[in-house]
Amino acid sequence: MALPIDFITRTRALLGEEFERLEAALSADVPVSIRINPMKGTPAPKAGAPVAWCESGFYLPERLSFTFDPLFHAGAYYVQEASSMFLEQAIKAYVKEPVRCLDLCAAPGGKSTHLASLLPDGSLLVSNEVIRSRSYVLAENIAKWGHPDTIVINNDPEDIGEALPHLFDVIVTDVPCSGEGMFRKDTDSTGEWSVDNVRLCASRGRRIIHDIWNALKPGGILIYSTCTYNTEEDEENIHYIIEELGAEALPIPTQEEWQITGALRFEPVSYTH
């Protein structure tokens, strides 16, 4: 894989000696993982090792033709990167009773279907997607998952913040980003990457959080995530949320064998089934 020169320079400065591991992993085969729908009670594809931080997550020995699998279309499972399933640990750590939860940037539905399975009974999940065409895909996946008490909406974060002040106990914001975490899965994405786009995405992420902040209850939980590695979109935006919006960073418990440390950076690694 031909990585952008600026990406190599910036990421090598960030990771130091670990950059070689990242570079090798980006050229390795992409592990395939799925999350089982606990409500369906139907068999899923033959799974391999479990995803350590997700009770319903499993790696597959090989990628299947999911579009030809009726169980996939019936919502018996969802194909999702294992790193995205770490949302489960944040919810388990801090959500103990029924809540009103907003998944702000929800399409295509991976985190929303996971939230639907995780939230305590009696919770309300609102799944939002600002791009109308993507909201149709989101609605389809939510319907296939089949969980009640879930609403799909198509609104701008600013409108939600103004119309629904202090309504949500939990807001999940998997904000649009420069997609550095997509390089291994979509090699064409390397050609779309640039430092200018990183800066644009970082600014957009701050705006999204600023616009939605008013919808979060005082003392509520905001979960911020991206699928990228740079500090502008990650640590610097977290710093903005803390310093400018008055948030408090909360720890998420992890197990030593997960090899997740510090700022919870998920970097692609080679995986052997």
Where are these regions (language model features)?
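Glycine-rich nucleotide cofactor-binding entry segment
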Residues: 1-167, 198-204, 244, 248-266
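Helix-to-beta-strand junctions that scaffold the AdoMet/dcAdoMet cofactor pocket
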Residues: 120, 216-217
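Mobile active-site "lid"/loop adjacent to the S-adenosyl-L-methionine
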Residues: 133, 170-211, 227-235, 253
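Glycine-rich, phosphate-binding/catalytic loops in enzymes
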Residues: 156, 188-191, 240
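Conserved strand-to-helix beginnings and helix N-cap segments that scaffold or border functional pockets
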Residues: 164-165, 234-238
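Conserved beta-strand signature within the Rossmann-like core of class I S-adenosyl-L-methionine
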Residues: 221-225
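Conserved small/polar residues in nucleotide/adenosyl-binding loops
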Residues: 272-273
